């Protein structure tokens, strides 16, 4: 037996319920638009940011008006123990420079010290600056030294052979040791710069005991660590 009118009524009721459901989910044009929560704008805290107070042209160390043709740069910078003097490396001119920042807003150049070789890094321990200097004649025969400079007088007081090309230097917190990375950099023109290329790099540890002339070096091999 067929009930066509009942079937039509059921279909109409189902369609009506579906439309009600869609209307409830989608919302009508009269519904209020959602609003984002109000967030107060933050106020920058100047004490938590780097704020430039001055600049210093390192070229002024070789010419008051930077008129000299001598190329200079400031690559690595360290501060004296009292924080009043900056020491920077200038590999292009083979020098280290000194800047007085007793008044940070008005830095004063104190001159530069010329070295035999390229300074690659500098660190400070006590009254001295420890300068890593690359003296290599070639990639296959790397050499270097640690030059010890008295900061106040800006004079060299000692040298220590490093037996390879140094890249960077750091001093332990207690001031008893200096660690020098002996890079012995590779020749990028050989085999596309691929490694291995000998001699291998290593770590040099300098025992800072006694006067600078009495400091000694210990080497730490870094080969075979991937095995």
Regions found by a protein language model. Name each.
Residues 25-34:
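Bacterial lipoprotein signal-peptidase II cleavage site
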Residues 2-13:
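Bacterial N-terminal signal peptides that target proteins for export
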Residues 20-24:
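C-terminal motif of bacterial Sec signal peptides marking the signal peptidase cleavage site
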Residues 34-42:
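Low-complexity, Pro/Ser/Thr-rich intrinsically disordered segments
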Residues 43-227:
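Mobile, glycine-rich extracellular loop/lid and propeptide segments
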